[in-house]
């Protein structure tokens, strides 16, 4: 393939990724052995990987995909010939360039509503673009940074990207995310929960007041979605609450129910709900909480339809308001 490739035309390679190719250590997926083998072959052949992107090629009604997060796409790898005189670089240079280039790419992907289940694979493109433009990436001891290690670093940067997004979230929601990441909706001791809450500059009492958690007999747990109150204007005190209410609406009422909530938002930007869904998908996926990951993935996949329906709902409400004013 390399021999017949032209310098001025990119090469595209289609790869059907399997969920079972993950190499798991503990609760987190470290790197895909399938990706490692594929990328190693491409880079060793002399190509530079310039992008990866998912394509909708798999049937969502397959038995393996029913109510799961089975990848709904194949991956397209875009490659070009690497310069014969490509230099080497240090791990430090690789990390600096990765952080500078990966985060804007992730923002563009989120804006395009790429499914969370596909985001980790799509993020490999801009990450490997940095790695593969060099002949070698060298560790401090002079050894070569392996593709496996590069993939792990890219995954770590993906986690860091989502973690940084929490900085703009209200304190109560940040506590909920911290509790969820460790305990989901299960109980923990009041003492442990209190330490987490105080670290985020709030309290368990505040979470109870906002109807985000229950605290009884020395135990605390996040309220599961069926336990949460219905959406009201007060819900907007917490991004966590609104996001969970939208997820619950999608499960019970579909896109229309979600659109009713989204069209009513005044203080919370709708895209903040989508961004938190990405983060919660990532947490649930790392923990192996399949059903939890599924609901957040479903929300992002449906987001364009939700926004369209929400816009229609807002227009209808404005027209009705104008008619009432005219009649008065």
PLM regions: where:
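Conserved Class I SAM-dependent methyltransferase catalytic core
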Residues: 1-50
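Short, flexible loop/turn elements at secondary-structure junctions
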Residues: 15-19, 51-57, 81-83
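Short, contiguous acidic/charged loop-to-helix segments that flank catalytic cores in large enzymes
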Residues: 18-33, 65-70, 111-114, 233-234, ...
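C-terminal accessory/interaction regions of large nucleic acid-associated machines
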Residues: 107-328
């Amino acid at each position: 393939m390399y021999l017949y490739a032209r310098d001025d035309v990119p090469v595209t390679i289609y790869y059907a990724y399997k969920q079972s190719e993950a190499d798991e250590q503990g609760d987190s997926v470290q790197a895909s052995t399938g990706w490692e083998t594929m990328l190693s072959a491409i880079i060793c052949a002399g190509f530079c990987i310039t992008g990866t992107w998912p394509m909708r090629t798999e049937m969502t009604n397959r038995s393996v995909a029913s109510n799961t997060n089975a990848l709904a796409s194949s991956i397209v790898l875009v490659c070009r010939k690497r310069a014969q005189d490509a230099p080497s670089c240090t791990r430090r240079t690789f990390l600096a360039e990765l952080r500078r280039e990966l985060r804007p790419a992730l923002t563009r992907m989120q804006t395009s509503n790429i499914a969370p289940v596909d985001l980790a694979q799509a993020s490999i493109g801009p990450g490997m673009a940095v790695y593969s433009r060099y002949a070698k990436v060298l560790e401090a001891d002079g050894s070569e940074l392996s593709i496996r290690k590069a993939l792990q670093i890219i995954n770590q940067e993906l986690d860091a990207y989502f973690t940084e997004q929490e900085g703009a979230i209200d304190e109560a929601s940040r506590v909920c995310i911290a509790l969820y990441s460790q305990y989901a909706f299960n109980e923990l001791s009041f003492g442990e929960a209190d330490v987490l809450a105080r670290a985020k500059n709030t309290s368990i009492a505040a979470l109870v007041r906002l109807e985000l958690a229950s605290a009884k007999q020395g135990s605390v747990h996040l309220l599961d979605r069926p336990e949460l109150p219905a959406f009201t204007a007060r819900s907007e005190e917490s991004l966590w609450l609104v996001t969970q209410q939208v997820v619950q609406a999608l499960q019970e009422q579909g896109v229309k129910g979600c659109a009713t909530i989204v069209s009513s938002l005044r203080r919370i930007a709708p895209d903040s709900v989508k961004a938190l869904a990405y983060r919660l998908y990532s947490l649930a996926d790392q923990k192996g909480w399949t059903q939890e990951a599924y609901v957040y993935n479903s929300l992002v996949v449906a987001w364009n339809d939700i926004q369209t329906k929400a816009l229609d709902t807002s227009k209808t409400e404005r027209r009705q308001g104008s008619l009432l004013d005219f009649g008065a």
